[in-house]
Amino acid sequence: MKKLLWVLILLLLPLTALAEDAESRRDGAFFYQIADGEAILTGCDWDAMQADSLYMFAEPPVSLEIPATLGGYPVTSIGGGVFCSLDGCPVDAPFEVVLPEGLRTLDAYTFTECFYATKITLPASLEIIPEGCFDRVPAEIDFPIGNPRYSCENGFLINNTTQTLLYTAPSSHGIALPAVRRLGDWSLSNYYLWYDDYDPVLPDTLESVGSYVFYDCGVTRVTFPDGITELSPFTFSCTALQEVHLPASLREIPDYCFWDCHLTALTIPDGVTRIGAQAFNGF
């Protein structure tokens, strides 16, 4: 009986450790969780941070530096929505964010709708920057040269491994899009967010386009180059859109591809073999 009890205790110990790791902890104004001996930043107490004299009396834009360690654990990941303006992130006052060296991973929604960020400094240690990470963020990106996976030039943040455009900073407006193979989810949301009168010239190298690339913008006409084989659900959600030229290379128009678009006419290429559910909702 005692032997069985010890076996059960030993089996439950890892579960107890996992439960403790999953608990939210706090270090100053920062909330975090522990996984494999490393800290994941999960949130900030913005009220406490703004009450701190260091921030209260600083001239905008305030510089917010994320610590390299929390509770003695190295910060290697930042979760989703941490800097979202809709979740309490400082509003009505511009601020800059400096992420620490040693950070390896950002979440797909880390900076979603962080409307008042003016500059984000990324560390050279970053290994994972997912699509959609900087959805509708009007910030410039400061990223060291030499990262083997990512680069940022002329305001364009690119995954060099997959040749995917991840982000377009405000300074990129008016500059030709880089020769990439894919426009990632939300990658052009800032390209048009403040400039609704700009119709894009897409690179000839383009093969696929992610979701929400043309979202809630004033773009009226889009011409896709030959070589495009893939669009995504919600690639378009743009009531101003009037004209789209699809290439002969396209094979499918996925579900919800032209969501809430008021096109007057559209020619479907002969090579398209599937049109998804509600692909032209609002047509």
Where are these regions (language model features)?
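Hydrophobic h-region of N-terminal signal peptides that target proteins for export
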Residues: 6-19
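Alpha-helix C-terminal capping segments
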Residues: 13, 57-58, 133-135, 236-237, ...
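Consensus positions within tandem repeat domains that build extended binding/scaffold surfaces
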Residues: 80-82, 108-110, 131-133, 186-187, ...
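Acidic, Ser/Thr
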Residues: 56, 82-87
